[in-house]
Swiss-Prot record:
Its EC number is 3.4.11.1, 3.4.11.10. It is found in: Cytoplasm. Belongs to the peptidase M17 family. GO terms for molecular function: manganese ion binding; metalloaminopeptidase activity. GO terms for cellular component: cytoplasm. The gene is pepA. It holds the Pfam family Peptidase_M17. Mn(2+) 2 binds at residues 263, 268, 286, 347. This is Probable cytosol aminopeptidase. NCBIfam families: PRK00913.1-2, PRK00913.1-4, PRK00913.2-2, PRK00913.2-4, PRK00913.3-5.
Length: 497
């Protein structure tokens, strides 16, 4: 059960029966925001000396409010050195605060730490951190944890800051971003018997209420388009495939659209090339790329982004049955290129091959970025701390990397090249869908590159970051929602009117 926060901004607030949270930068001689109101007895200074608290980044000090304060509890959050503060630290501080709400139903947060410049954007980022940390997924638990049962469904949160008027306006964007990230997390966390291709497409259709144009292509339309690579993956499942096309037209009519394409394998058994049983339950998250694209479209529409954006997601289930695709099959993709199937567990690239070609052919976008939980090889290379970035365009790659640094959804650029491309040549078709273990993430990217033509393109392999990544101040969920904030920042920084 996710906590519900009613967040407001003000220049002062009543502390009666509240949890009071104050922020402190290191090296500020124990000065804290809101000290005169929340801590008239100076208990924070005394407790800091006794405990050795020095306001290091995201360190906390939790004390009972002193006599003379109308608050119930005091929490100090360290910000570290002011010179080292970056935008993402405000999200982390918000998440740290939310983790300490416990049973409080009223919280007052003094944001203006001495020695720290707090902008409206910083205050809004703090609020975003609160919202993201509040998320939890326990919809299918009939008995909640005892702490959760006692947690109030609604917490009144007042953020006290001199920038309160502008922060209130800026927080609307924070709410939009939180909504998109939470949508992506929900999609990844949902069980596969609940979220099939049809049900996922219905989730995409719900974006219409935000003004997104949504078109759903069924099996008949996909066959007519010649999407045999995508259809080949789906043919072993009793659940029919879908292609969801989402359009947000917030920019000028003359502006070229930008496009995001997501892999949406709602469950991946590996097909005939069956995966080991141990850990297969995690393959409900093999649609993390499609979840991120859907979450991004939510954000852009909710905040009324001034850009024309296309989101395309290929939705299939990869199952073994008597009609399933076989190793040795050859399929003709929408592009006309032929593909020899070597491994049916290299299915995501087949879905993306047709989805990318369709997007390029129909919309002629300024660029295309695809997201996919594509290869286990990328987790060997980068673990679950960064996603792999492959691109045929240096400017796009640089902008993506910068957005990754700004949002802490980090990317590491990986190589592409003719020598790698040769590895996926087939004896019997134009290419093969798998070339073995060596350079697995690179050859997968080379495969995708054959379906983008001259369009500037980037491929983000998010196999290590979309699910099961390390828990942070702003994410305590198995499904992380990775990519939503990253791509929203890319659009905001470079592609809005």
């Amino acid at each position: 059960m996710s906590a519900k926060f009613d967040i407001s901004f003000a220049n002062s607030a009543s502390l009666e029966n509240a949890l009071a949270i104050v922020l402190q930068a290191s090296g500020e001689a124990q000065a804290v925001a809101g000290a005169s109101e929340a801590d008239p007895g100076g208990v924070i200074e005394r407790a800091s000396k006794i405990s050795g608290f020095s306001a290091k980044s995201m360190a906390t000090l939790d004390v009972i409010a002193p006599q003379g304060s109308s608050a119930d509890r005091l929490l100090v959050i360290g910000l570290g050195k002011p010179s080292k503060l970056v935008a993402h630290d405000w999200l982390r501080a918000g998440g740290t605060a939310a983790a300490h709400f416990k049973k409080a139903d009223k919280v007052v947060i003094y944001l203006d730490a001495p020695g720290v410049e707090v902008s409206a954007e910083a205050a809004a980022d703090f609020a975003l951190g609160l919202l993201l940390r509040a998320y939890s997924f326990d919809a299918y638990k009939t008995k909640k944890k005892s702490d959760d049962e006692k947690t109030p469904k609604k917490v009144d949160v007042t953020i006290v800051t001199a920038a309160h008027k502008d922060a209130e306006k800026a927080s609307a964007v924070s709410e939009a971003i939180a909504g998109g990230v939470i949508l992506a997390r929900d999609l990844v966390n949902l069980p596969p018997n609940v979220l099939g291709p049809v049900e996922f497409a219905e989730k995409a259709e719900e974006l219409r209420k935000l003004g997104v144009d949504v078109e759903i292509l069924g099996e008949k339309e996909l066959k007519k388009l010649g999407m045999n690579a995508l259809l080949g993956v789906a043919q072993g499942s009793a659940r029919p495939p879908r292609l969801a096309v989402m359009q947000w037209n917030g920019g000028s009519k003359k502006d070229e659209p930008i496009a995001f394409v997501g892999k949406g394998v709602v469950f991946d058994t590996g097909g005939i090339s069956l995966k080991p049983g141990l850990g297969m339950e995690d393959m409900k998250g093999d649609m993390g790329g499609a979840a991120a694209v859907t979450g991004l479209m939510h954000v852009l529409a909710a905040r009324k982004a001034k850009a024309n954006v296309i989101g395309v997601i290929g939705l299939v289930e990869n199952m073994p049955d008597g009609n399933a695709q076989r190793p040795g099959d050859i399929v003709t993709s929408m592009s006309g290129q032929t593909i020899e199937i070597i491994n049916t567990d290299a299915e995501g690239r087949l879905v993306l091959a047709d989805a990318l070609w369709y997007t390029k052919d129909r919309f002629n976008p300024k660029f295309m970025i695809n997201l996919a939980t594509l290869t286990g090889a990328i987790t060997v290379a980068l673990g679950n701390l960064q996603a792999g970035l492959f691109s045929n365009d240096d400017e796009l790659a640089t902008r993506l990397a910068e957005a990754g640094e700004a949002t802490a959804e980090k990317l590491w650029r990986m190589p592409l090249g003719k020598d790698y491309d040769k590895i996926i040549d087939s004896k019997f078709a134009d290419m093969k869908n798998s070339s073995g273990r060596l350079a697995g993430s690179v050859t997968a990217a080379q495969f995708l590159k054959r379906f983008v033509g001259e369009t500037p393109w980037a491929h983000l392999d998010i196999a290590g970051t979309a699910m099961g990544s390390p828990l942070t101040e702003i994410n305590q969920s198995w499904g992380s929602g990775y990519g939503v904030r990253l791509l929203n920042e890319l659009v905001r920084a470079h592609y809005e009117d």
